């Protein structure tokens, strides 16, 4: 507690006693844990898996006597490309040929056949061309050198020394 009455002071007299208030006492905090509430786990309803049937075997289409025939021809005057091919199949026998113009202007023709008994066979024919292929010489253009440019530079600035005169009074 506190002192009930104030201390009496006399003018000029020393302090007779000092009084201090008693320390404040604190009680320990009361700790109470809040109750923990647990909810029952939610049960998830899962649908039964979908049953899949095994894929049905698909019978591959089989042609016991395959047949085809094709041909193409390229004559490109811009690039000089000249080639042709044709091929025919009847059952297991393939026959065809292709031709092209070689760089020297000759024409190469290949005739071929393929069958289960003889395998693949090719016969190459080479005919002299009507005109040899033009030879294009690639020459680099000469490098042009320019005379070095002369840069005009201004003359350096001249500075005069300061002139000190006598001041008149």
Swiss-Prot record:
Pfam families: Chitin_bind_4 (PF00379). Residues 65-135 form the Chitin-binding type R&R domain. GO terms for cellular component: extracellular matrix; extracellular space. Keywords: Cuticle, Repeat. InterPro entries: CHIT_BIND_RR_consensus (IPR031311), Insect_cuticle (IPR000618), Insect_Cuticle_Struc_Prot (IPR051217). Sequence repeats lie at residues 21-24, 27-30, 33-36, 39-42, 47-50, 53-56, 140-143, 146-149, 160-163. It comes from the Eukaryota. The keyword Repeat applies. GO terms for molecular function: structural constituent of cuticle. Component of the cuticle of migratory locust which contains more than 100 different structural proteins. The tetrapeptide (A-A-P-[AV]) repeats found throughout the protein are also present in many proteins constituting the protective envelope of other species. This is Cuticle protein 21. It comes from Locusta migratoria. The gene is ACP21.
């Amino acid at each position: 507690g506190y002192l009930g009455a104030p201390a009496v002071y006399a003018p000029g007299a020393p302090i007779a006693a000092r009084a201090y208030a008693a320390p404040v006492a604190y009680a320990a905090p009361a700790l109470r844990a809040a109750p923990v509430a647990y909810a029952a786990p939610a049960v998830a309803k899962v649908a039964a898996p979908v049953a899949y049937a095994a894929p049905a075997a698909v019978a591959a289409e089989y042609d016991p006597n395959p047949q085809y025939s094709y041909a193409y021809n390229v004559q490109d005057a811009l690039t000089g490309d000249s080639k042709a091919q044709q091929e025919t199949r009847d059952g297991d026998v393939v026959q065809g040929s292709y031709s092209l113009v070689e760089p020297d202007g000759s024409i190469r023709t290949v005739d071929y056949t393929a069958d289960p008994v003889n395998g693949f066979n090719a016969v190459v024919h080479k005919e002299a061309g009507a005109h040899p292929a033009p030879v294009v010489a690639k020459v680099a253009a000469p490098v042009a050198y320019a005379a070095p440019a002369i840069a005009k530079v201004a003359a350096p600035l001249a500075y005069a020394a300061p002139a000190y005169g006598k001041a008149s009074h």
